[in-house]
Curated annotation (Swiss-Prot):
GO molecular function: anthranilate phosphoribosyltransferase activity; magnesium ion binding
Ligand binding (anthranilate 1): G81, N112
One Pfam family matching this protein: Glycos_trans_3N
Protein name (Swiss-Prot/TrEMBL): Anthranilate phosphoribosyltransferase
Regions crossing the membrane: none
Binding site for Mg(2+) 2: D226, E227
Cofactor: Mg(2+)
Catalytic activity: N-(5-phospho-beta-D-ribosyl)anthranilate + diphosphate = 5-phospho-alpha-D-ribose 1-diphosphate + anthranilate
Binding-site residues, Mg(2+) 1: S93, E227
Broad enzyme group: transferase
């Protein structure tokens, strides 16, 4: 506790924490040792000053050390967004996950209930008939038998209950909004991560590299979406062969037409689930296109595609051949088995 007071004092002066100091501070918070006032003070001091790559790397270390792990193949991928983009859109990364799985890539998806929309990944999947309150062993069985599994964040990060009340009272974004997508309980090393702000694209790619990721895309749409957008360019930081490259992609790069955000407005969990199922059943339109675009990037990360156009073609085959829909049916069956 005294150590934490020293670290809070350090951050309060505008100084930055080392990875080790950040890990110690977040261990103190997530273990329940820190008081609510100490948590709130540290989280807001970091937020106001701006969190560094080393601080996020250390916080992720603490979070990963306490999570309940899931066994998954080494080549599994995660398609995940931070949420909090305020768009209220349909569940793009969830739909893309089924497309990727239908293309033959194992998906270990990590997610939560809604942050700023009316339907997060967990809400949508539950509305589709998938059981989300599974043990790590049950999720592992889904991944092995269905080729896709969903890890409901609160079930795998029980230590988060110690910081939950403080986060609710602060009612503003904190470093914890960034940590979830970086703390996959299956330990995946191939990630497609959407973030709510352009400022985090390159830093989070660096954090993933620091934690041993082999291949990753961190993305932010120019319209604010925490996905690759159809509305215009998307900012990307790609981790490939130990190097991070930043660039922009557009729908045209993938052979797709632009569409504005209104075409992707979502509803509640039931409405979003129905929209997702319609795409998996072959319905054309903007939701199909944006899901294909994001799936294409995940297929590049998985090493299945070299370009977005190639990824879109593979994804279209997954949809039109019934592979993606079959993955949904398999996950419903295995999760309820």
């Amino acid at each position: 506790m005294d150590d934490l007071k020293v670290l809070i004092g350090k951050v309060a002066t505008g100084a930055t924490l080392t990875r080790e100091e950040a890990a110690a501070a977040f261990n103190s918070m997530m273990s329940g040792e820190a008081t609510p006032s100490q948590m709130g003070g540290l989280l807001m001091a970091l937020r106001v000053r701006g969190e560094t790559v080393d601080e996020i790397t250390g916080a992720v270390s603490a979070m990963r050390s306490m999570m309940l792990r899931v066994k998954a193949p080494v080549d599994a991928v995660d398609v995940v967004g931070t949420g909090g983009d305020g768009s209220g859109s349909v569940n793009v990364s969830t739909c893309a996950s089924f497309i990727v799985a239908g293309a033959g890539v194992t998906v270990a998806k990590h997610g939560n209930r809604a942050l700023s929309s009316r339907s997060g990944a967990a809400d949508c999947l539950a509305a589709l008939g998938i059981r989300i309150d599974l043990t790590p062993e049950q999720v592992g069985r889904c991944i092995n038998e269905a080729g896709i599994g969903f890890m409901f964040a609160p079930a795998h990060h029980p230590a988060m209950k110690n910081v939950g009340p403080t986060r609710v009272e602060l009612a503003t974004r904190t470093i914890f909004n960034l940590l979830g997508p970086l703390s996959n309980p299956a330990g995946v090393r191939r990630q497609m991560v959407g973030v709510f702000s352009r400022q985090w694209v390159q830093p989070l790619a660096q954090v993933l590299k620091n934690h041993g990721s082999e291949s990753a895309w961190v993305v932010h749409g120019s319209d604010g979406l925490d996905e690759i957008t159809l509305a215009g360019p998307t900012f990307v930081a790609a981790l490939e062969d130990g190097n991070i490259r930043t660039f922009e992609v557009t729908p045209e790069d993938a052979g797709l037409e632009r569409a504005d955000g209104d075409a992707l407005k979502g509803g509640d969990a039931e409405a979003n689930a129905a929209s997702l199922r319609a795409v998996l059943e072959g319905k054309p339109g903007a939701f199909r296109d944006v899901a294909l675009l994001n799936a294409a990037a995940a297929l590049i990360v998985a090493g299945k595609a070299k370009t977005l156009k190639e990824g879109v073609a593979l994804g279209a085959k997954s949809l039109d051949g019934g592979g993606a829909l079959n993955k949904l049916k398999q996950l419903i069956a295995v999760s309820n088995g």
